[in-house]
Structures are given as structure tokens and as C-alpha cells.
Curated annotation (Swiss-Prot):
Binding site for [4Fe-4S] cluster 2: C111, C115, C118
Name of the molecule in the record: Lipoyl synthase
Encoding gene (name): lipA
Organism the protein comes from: Pseudomonas fluorescens (strain SBW25)
GO molecular function, one term: 4 iron, 4 sulfur cluster binding
Entries under SMART domains matching the protein: Elp3
Binding site for [4Fe-4S] cluster 1: C85, C90, C96, S325
Pfam families named in the record: LIAS_N, Radical_SAM
Amino acid sequence: MTTDAVQTMIPTLDITERPAPAPRAKVEAGVKLRGAEKVARIPVKIIPTTELPKKPDWIRVRIPVSPEVDRIKALLRKHKLHSVCEEASCPNLGECFSGGTATFMIMGDICTRRCPFCDVGHGRPKPLDVNEPESLAIAIADLKLKYVVITSVDRDDLRDGGAQHFADCIREIRKLSPNVMLETLVPDYRGRMDVALEITAAEPPDVFNHNLETVPRLYKAARPGSDYQWSLTLLQKFKQMMPHIPTKSGLMLGLGETDEEVIEVMKRMREHDIDMLTLGQYLQPSRSHLPVQRFVHPDTFAWFAEEGYKMGFKNVASGPLVRSSYHADEQAKLVKASLVS
């Protein structure tokens, strides 16, 4: 599809490979690095953007101010929980919180990776909070939620990548809220896939989600420390172990990919038995993050959705403000019903 007429192009920022940085003292556990500090030691050099691009008319986000937003934030603080909605500066925070839903981020708010598209802080995480599974379960019961998404920071410091902590959270949640549907948005479990999947299969979610994030050509710049094929294999292996559970993945558009590359990744997803797809616009969190290379028009997102359904995806959520957990409850119900029938 020719998209010149439906995209606002942004000049490419110089992202160049650089030599490995000199060793330095370890960051103290619990110290969160963000922005320029976070991306200072990744394999590519990111030159800070002098001026953030003007967003087109189709990207307008209301300020998340309402009693329900305040109530959920207060509850999260009470139980010492984190939401990815806040940590990753999600544009749908107001809509989701106002609707009484949230995506919970477990295992702390400090990530062991330095992905330069992401607004979550980097550093040396503190030890896992053994009370978090119970606290999360109580919060979900208090909110009377029917559908919950659980995600996490990357925890490369843990032998199982945090898989057992996910399982513990699922078990505790189902004790207090047996009818709730649970979606997990997991890290890639780098170097520990098999043990992580064995743990996951013993306490499975209702939807298993892991995002590819971008096309393989851009992995070195956007996902340092991650591997495109590894992520595809993780999703496929889970599906082989638990064929009745939907698998899900997503891409951010606007990092410099072409439409043809997006279509190719979608084809690869289907070859790896992925059931559900999300496509959304990348929005640069700060001047120190990867720059937006284009704003994809809603018509192009609609075209991707059409192509996705032709390929056999059971659900495609594709739009400028779509994120992994956006209207996830509605999508999951449709897909679960189709897998059962």
C-alpha cells in the first residue's frame, strides 16, 4: 500500500553504532535511570531530539483527570503496586482508569533492559516483594475487575526471569477472584525460555501475550539485548504446550519501519501460530528516546487490520492509540469463544 498521502514524515535522527562504553561503578539497587541516563550505554548512540514533532490531528489524548482515576491511583499506592499505564506513559491511561480497569506491572518498576523507546526506568532492581502476589489479588478484588492484564519489567537478574512470580500472582488472584480473566504480557525470558514456559504452563493465564515491538531490522536500535526469532519461538512454544489458550503480540509503528516490513512480520506471526495482534503508533516519551520517524494515518492502520484478518488473525486491534491492553477484555472474549467453538 502506498502511504505517502496518509503519513506525516519526520526527518530521520542520526542513530549511529558506537564502541562499547568504559566500565563504571554499579548503580545502587533501587536507583532508577531514565531518559539520557538510561540510554547512555546502549550499543547505538541516540542524539537527543532538539524539538519533538507536532502530533497530527488524529492523535489527541484527554488529560486523565477524574475521581475514578484518582481512586485507582490511590489504591495502587495503598498496596504498593505499579501500573504500566503510568510507568510507560500510556496515552489511554485516562480512558482505562476511568473505566475502572488497569494493567498491573509486577516485580518492581526498574527494568534490567535499556530499550530506548520505553519510558520505564532502568537500573538494578530490588529483590522481589514476596507479598506482591497477595497484595495484587486484594487490589483486584477491591476493584471488582473482570479482566486484568499483568505485565512486568524485564528481570534478567532472576534465574527464571520472573516466571514463578507471574504464576504466584495468577494463583493468588484466582483465590479471591475466581471468575476474573487474566492476560499476561511477559518478557522474553532470555536464556531461560524452557524453564519459564514449564512454570507458566502449570499456572496458565487466559491469554499469553509477548510483544515483538518492531521489525527485525530495527531490533539492534530499539530492543538491545533482545532477539526477534527468540520472541517468535517463545510464543510458538507456549501455543504448542497450551493450544486452547490464545497467544497475542504487538508492534509499535513509527520507528522507521516500512509497510512492507510490517506485513512480513505479520506473516511470520501467523506462521508461529499467534492468534491476536495489536498495532499502535509509537510516541516518543522524551527527547532522549528514539525519535518518531512517521505518524501513521488511521487509514493505514485500518488497512493493516484488513490484511491481518485475511492472514487468519482471530482479532486485530489496529489504530494510532492502540496499546497491548487497550480493550483487551473485549478482544479476548471474542477469541476465546472462537477457540472453544
